[in-house]
Design a protein with these regions (language model features):
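Solvent-exposed, non-transmembrane regions of membrane-associated and secreted proteins
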Residues: 1-197
Length: 197
C-alpha cells in the first residue's frame, strides 16, 4: 500500500507567548485529531505537580496534560511520556480509550504536538492496555539498539490494526498514557512516531 501522506497543516494556531505568561511550565499543545482532544501540555518538577493542578495553577481534580518530569521539554528524547487523567466526563484523556474501544483510529491515526519552535505531527503505530510498571515507560534519550528493540516491542503489542510506519534509532515517539480505570494500576497507552522531521 502507498505510505500514508501525513497532514502538514496544523489544526490550530497557539499563542505560546500568552500561555507562557500564565505559566512558563507550558511546553506544548496536544491535539488528537480522531478524538478532538486539545490541551496545553505542561511539565512540572515531578509527576505529582500537575496531577490535580491546571496549567493556570488552580487546584482541580482533572489536573493537566503533562510531560514526564524526566523527559527533555523539547520532545527530543527517543520517547516522551505524556500523562492525562481518564476523566469520566471525557475531559483530559477520558476519550483516549475510544481509540481502541470505538475504533477511532479509523477516523485519523495522527496527533499533533505544537511547540513554540515547531508544529510536529505524529502517526499512531500502537495502542494497548498495560500496567503502571510496564516497560513502555522506560525512557530512552534516543538512539541505540535497545531503543530500536523497544520500538519493535511496543509496535508488536498494538491492540489496534494500524499501518506500521518505518522507525529506526533516530525516531522520536510520544507515549500518551492514561489510567484504564480509577481503582487499578492498569493503564491505556497510545504511541505515535514523529513524521515531519
Amino acid at each position: 500500500p502507498e505510505p500514508l501522506s501525513y497532514p502538514t497543516e496544523p489544526p490550530l494556531a497557539v499563542d505560546f507567548e500568552s500561555l507562557k505568561a500564565i505559566n512558563p511550565d507550558v511546553k506544548g499543545w496536544l491535539y488528537i485529531e480522531a478524538l478532538d482532544i486539545s490541551y496545553p501540555v505542561v511539565q512540572g518538577p515531578d509527576n505529582d505537580a500537575y496531577l490535580h493542578t491546571t496549567y493556570e495553577g488552580t487546584s482541580n481534580f482533572a489536573g493537566s496534560i503533562f510531560l514526564d518530569y524526566q523527559n527533555r521539554d523539547d520532545f527530543s528524547d527517543g520517547n516522551t511520556i505524556v500523562y492525562g487523567h481518564n476523566m469520566k466526563n471525557l475531559s483530559m484523556f477520558g476519550k483516549l480509550k475510544q481509540m481502541k474501544e470505538q475504533e477511532k483510529y479509523r477516523d485519523s491515526v495522527y496527533f499533533w504536538m505544537l511547540t513554540p519552535e515547531s508544529n510536529d505531527v505524529y502517526q499512531i503505530f500502537s495502542a494497548f492496555y498495560t500496567e503502571a510498571d510496564s516497560d513502555v515507560y522506560t525512557l530512552y534519550s534516543g538512539g541505540g539498539e535497545a531503543f530500536v528493540q523497544y520500538l519493535n516491542t511496543m509496535a508488536a503489542r498494538s491492540e489496534i490494526p494500524v499501518e506500521q510506519p518505518e522507525m529506526d534509532e533516530h525516531s522520536h515517539i510520544i507515549v500518551l498514557s492514561t489510567c484504564a480505570a480509577s481503582d487499578t494500576t492498569g493503564r491505556f497507552v497510545v504511541l505515535g512516531v514523529r513524521r515531519n522531521r
